[in-house]
Amino acid sequence: MELFQAKDHYILQQGERALWCSRRDGGLQLRPATDLLLAWNPICLGLVEGVIGKIQLHSDLPWWLILIRQKALVGKLPGDHEVCKVTKIAVLSLSEMEPQDLELELCKKHHFGINKPEKIIPSPDDSKFLLKTFTHIKSNVSAPNKKKVKESKEKEKLERRLLEELLKMFMDSESFYYSLTYDLTNSVQRQSTGERDGRPLWQKVDDRFFWNKYMIQDLTEIGTPDVDFWIIPMIQGFVQIEELVVNYTESSDDEKSSPETPPQESTCVDDIHPRFLVALISRRSRHRAGMRYKRRGVDKNGNVANYVETEQLIHVHNHTLSFVQTRGSVPVFWSQVGYRYNPRPRLDRSEKETVAYFCAHFEEQLNIYKKQVIINLVDQAGREKIIGDAYLKQVLLFNNSHLTYVSFDFHEHCRGMKFENVQTLTDAIYDIILDMKWCWVDEAGVICKQEGIFRVNCMDCLDRTNVVQAAIARVVMEQQLKKLGVMPPEQPLPVKCNRIYQIMWANNGDSISRQYAGTAALKGDFTRTGERKLAGVMKDGVNSANRYYLNRFKDAYRQAVIDLMQGIPVTEDLYSIFTKEKEHEALHKENQRSHQELISQLLQSYMKLLLPDDEKFHGGWALIDCDPSLIDATHRDVDVLLLLSNSAYYVAYYDDEVDKVNQYQRLSLENLEKIEIGPEPTLFGKPKFSCMRLHYRYKEASGYFHTLRAVMRNPEEDGKDTLQCIAEMLQITKQAMGSDLPIIEKKLERKSSKPHEDIIGIRSQNQGSLAQGKNFLMSKFSSLNQKVKQTKSNVNIGNLRKLGNFTKPEMKVNFLKPNLKVNLWKSDSSLETMENTGVMDKVQAESDGDMSSDNDSYHSDEFLTNSKSDEDRQLANSLESVGPIDYVLPSCGIIASAPRLGSRSQSLSSTDSSVHAPSEITVAHGSGLGKGQESPLKKSPSAGDVHILTGFAKPMDIYCHRFVQDAQNKVTHLSETRSVSQQASQERNQMTNQVSNETQSESTEQTPSRPSQLDVSLSATGPQFLSVEPAHSVASQKTPTSASSMLELETGLHVTPSPSESSSSRAVSPFAKIRSSMVQVASITQAGLTHGINFAVSKVQKSPPEPEIINQVQQNELKKMFIQCQTRIIQI
């Protein structure tokens, strides 16, 4: 259609129709095409594709008209319906301001012989000049003063920034789609119910997904049939349409294409191979729309953030099959403060205040989709636990039989980048998938309908959600194709079809992620290729950091634009964003200057923790370990800290999930054989990085090495200079010991190291990062490496040979929290048959009142590096002979005990692992016990009597009263009878009082805080209590629901977690402790339900500050909820 500019109007005309847009008040009206003759000096500006609507960026500013400048054909849906994507828009100010360069395609009728638009419209410089002149005239006419001039400039700047975000929203993300003949807002099933509806397309759309409804409101209110032509319903989301050929003899062409660019289909395909059309349509709800940290949870209307309906269409011959899934934020009132990296989620309203809005959300969902299968992927421990517990509690309160709640801890099951373990979920809910069916339509009508829907969510409903939705949709598609005879019954999808299908879902995840978080989806490489690769891990780190950066000062503008598009008043003071932006820029510059200092402090903190007092610190570097053999073959590309002392080097590993160092190795320099530096080993393509391989011996055996590389900020660098500098430092240090260390430059062989031995694990009792988040570190590491590189040429290596003069720097480090627990992995075959010869007595001191779990500041852990007292040395000497592998690490007061097999830390995957269980190590913390006082817990259990060891911690929130944090706070012996249990409860109360009294007496004497005495209590007869262990880690355990767990269910006894589980840094919900493959609490007999309830309720412990009666009421309330619950609860 043609766009004309007149004195008072912009006129859109096609054929006999014309739409006049007023440049005075922004009004829209329909007029005949012949009225163009009445316009004052109309000029044709070019061609446009359609009208999106109009928007007012500020109440004091004019309206803007948004037009489709350029579109791209996505494909054709069944019925030959074309689907188009908006690629470029044009924005016109509905005012007297002259339009700037619109770059429109020229109309051949009015611009015959003119190819360049600048010949008929002013140049950009002229437009800017006119704009400035017009603004200047306006300000002069209104008799300005300084205040008004400043306000005018701020309004212009604000309008400019919002307009910039509007253009980026439409053109950068390419996330708006439309069809002139097909209803993209409704699924095939919903469309099939109203096939005979004669209303125009825009009146039949689903209001939830009609994204430009408010912007085009002037036209929808006209009410005449003539307006139908101008209204184009749009969706925000994703659409991709592909035709696949089922050919099992065709190669996948993996070597000829990258994951981002699928191989081209052959132009000539045999007719004997069946074809089918696959379409993926994602529709984002316009209700509670917005950006990641600006929109979370539910609102007062029951709408949730990031709600997306995804439909997968399969079309074969005349048959169309549809399967629909949804995603959406957890429907409770929660938020995350987005101005810090990886902010901690928090609940904004109480449980009772949330119930009504939770019910409103699911009542609407059940009304639309009939049944709901909730798949909750949030972590059942750690910082996400508070949201998962709130979700489960609301489900129990909602108590609807049409709801099914499935909990799947994605990070726990897929730890170590084993994302293929998602099949565990699809296998567990396979029957539910088949029972849900799908919509099947042919020319005659509806054959069957989908009965229910999967509602998948994680915290952001992005990365994890997309992987799981793709897995479920694939199961459904394979069943559909087999029903239609396109696929053989026992054959999987052909490799080439599978690859294109994976790319479609990966693109879907990227598009939704860009709309909500501003960057592409993490884990997208797994969705594309089915495996996790090095490039994907590194890209995830960059994208995660980008999300944080974007949120700092861009999300506020984008959120304001989205709200204005939907007619929602902007509540945030947009003018204050300018100040925030300046503050951020200043802070960013300051952070750049202090990168070196931050990394230095981080290295110093771990140096103080890991290095003994008799070793001297020589240097530390931030690197990446490329060797896949740490713990198991799935650990790749782990961020590490390499610390060098005068006699050893330490490799400290970062955990992706908890964002802190949780394990390290100490390797003697005497065992360091050689260093190799060269290009990284690759199968295809040119190596991008240089790597350093440190070869070492273990028990006189070779074949062990670490492959490390530097993280460089500049992609053009390979980090070789940094690695050479590190290698020279290692060489000099070893030469100072009287031995030489060869440095060899060569192309590294593609091989794996032998499994590393003696890996020591560090776990923090408190929540939060130990120093900084992993991805924050990645952005800092390159600064350190760059610093090393720059100083290399200025350092005289010869002067560094006398390394005996290095002293451990005295620096106060406030990164570490004092409560630490450590696990030691021992790769010793004797551990497999060894008895559990002792149980560690744990003493946990009260935390300082000012230490919050959501605080960025950390108290120093100075006692770890202070010199030991004589009493401590005597205690250490007395404990060194505790057991065959029990020993003391005198450098930091760590006491090791015998191993306990089947610990949680070994549950790396669902498959068997050759790695042995860690020994339990407890780090002493100042307990306040006087020198002459004996710990009340200093007793050894015997077979004749039962005693309870309690170590309560302060609850993090209200749900800690109801969902016990027994995995990190409490160790409880079991009683075999109820009478004995009551007696043990009395003993526990007396013991707690004794600890309190001794603490008071010690505070009166003002004894300084120092490490407490820890005694290791041994039991020659092994454990005297039941425990729930992972099935794969205990040899005698035949099935997931074996002796211990079944006995517990039958007797109703309390279950004591294993020491390693109790020392975990993640607070685990009660359902996370169920280690069976699946537990269902519903739709079973009353007796079986009672057993299940007793199991769940047994996990609800009491907190010491709570009165006995309150805890009993809470326990009874939870038990009653489970008894009356009609919702099926499934834990996988």
Curated annotation (Swiss-Prot):
Q: Which organism is it from?
A: Homo sapiens (Human)
- Tell me where in this chain the PTM Phosphoserine is found: S827, S830, S878, S881, S907, S910, S1103
The cross-references to InterPro entries, in alphabetical order and at most eight, read:
hSac2, Inositol_phosphatase, SAC_dom
Record protein name field? Phosphatidylinositide phosphatase SAC2
**hSac2 domain: which residues?**
593-760
Q: How does it assemble?
A: Homodimer. Interacts with OCRL and RAB5A. Interacts with INPP5B and INPP4A. Interacts with STAT3; the interaction is independent of STAT3 'Tyr-705' phosphorylation status.
Q: Where is the SAC domain?
A: 167-518
GO CC, alphabetical = axon; clathrin-coated endocytic vesicle; clathrin-coated pit; dendrite; early endosome; early endosome membrane; intracellular membrane-bounded organelle; neuronal cell body
Pfam family of this protein, just one? Syja_N
